[in-house]
Curated annotation (Swiss-Prot):
One of its GO terms (molecular function) is 3-deoxy-manno-octulosonate cytidylyltransferase activity. Transmembrane segments: none annotated. This is 3-deoxy-manno-octulosonate cytidylyltransferase. Pathway: Nucleotide-sugar biosynthesis; CMP-3-deoxy-D-manno-octulosonate biosynthesis; CMP-3-deoxy-D-manno-octulosonate from 3-deoxy-D-manno-octulosonate and CTP: step 1/1; Bacterial outer membrane biogenesis; lipopolysaccharide biosynthesis. Belongs to the KdsB family. Its EC number is 2.7.7.38. It comes from Tolumonas auensis (strain DSM 9187 / NBRC 110442 / TA 4). It is found in: Cytoplasm. Keywords: Cytoplasm, Lipopolysaccharide biosynthesis, Nucleotidyltransferase, Transferase. Its main location: cytoplasm. GO terms for cellular component: cytosol. It catalyses: 3-deoxy-alpha-D-manno-oct-2-ulosonate + CTP = CMP-3-deoxy-beta-D-manno-octulosonate + diphosphate. The keyword 4Fe-4S does not apply. HAMAP family: KdsB.
């Protein structure tokens, strides 16, 4: 199986400006993400940038750099521009890995690509079991429910499914495995072009979840439980310090 990894790496971030270039033990954050994409066995790794400073840093990493526009409203739109510039065949498997996840396990990059290759759905993603009550009721943790064949029924910031009887008890009782969606996607290149041609859907606007556009248009998304639970990405300076400490501990143990 052959697949391409595209890593969107925007320079601007409201919480952490210059995030792709943030130093983590002598390397920019984007370098750590690129290393994991290579370890996953991608046939090609492309970093989609919108700033020359990020492009310069990536050019030294031995992967492709694609300069993209600053007008995109979503990561998928940026991905579509990359697909157009590289003229990928419609059935090419594209894995979108976020540029702010320096600890992403290579195994789950390979897993989501393999899952797409073995399903009729045009898009695949992953989820992990929720084990913490705070996360279960946190709107920043996106929940997903699937049918018996592993296709998404719905993604929501709300707690789904709602365990009416279990949650009515004090303390709340869980009688179901709840799943948190993690933001890694695999697509067929042709489907990415189709996706960006659709208007924004009402559910997508309400939940602020772009994958709901796919379900709105009656297409399928394959969902599987991730082989490894990925550590959190980097959204804030505090997150960055946590990653630095984590990697520092690993280096000191070697």
């Amino acid at each position: 199986m052959s697949f391409v990894v595209v890593i969107p790496a925007r320079y601007q971030s409201s919480r952490l400006p210059g995030k792709p270039l943030a130093d983590i033990h002598g390397k920019p954050m984007i370098a750590w993400v690129v290393e994991r994409a290579k370890q996953a066995g991608a046939s090609q790794v492309i970093v989609a940038v919108d700033d020359e400073r990020v492009a310069a840093a990536v050019s030294a990493l031995g992967v492709d750099v694609c300069m993209t526009g600053s007008h995109h409203q979503s990561g998928t739109e940026r991905l579509a521009e990359v697909c157009e510039k590289y003229a990928f065949a419609p059935d090419t498997i594209i894995v979108n890995v976020q540029g702010d996840e320096p600890l992403i396990p290579p195994a789950i990059i390979t897993q989501v690509a393999d899952n797409l290759a073995n399903t009729s759905a045009p898009m695949a993603t992953l989820a992990v079991a929720i084990e913490d009550e705070h996360e279960l009721f946190n709107p920043n943790a996106v929940k997903v429910v699937m049918d018996k064949q592993g296709y998404a029924l719905y993604f929501s910031r709300a707690t789904i499914p709602w365990d009416r009887d279990g949650f009515a008890q004090q303390p709340k009782q869980w009688r179901h495995t709840f799943l948190r969606h993690i933001g890694i996607y695999a697509y067929r290149a042709g489907f990415i072009r189709q996706y960006v041609s659709w208007p924004v859907s009402p559910l997508e606007q309400i939940e602020s979840l772009e994958q709901l556009r796919v379900l709105w248009h009656s297409e399928k998304i394959h969902v599987a439980v991730a082989a490894e639970n990925p550590p959190a990405g980097v959204d804030t300076a505090e997150d960055l310090e946590k990653v630095r400490r984590f990697l520092g501990n690993i280096k000191s143990e070697k």
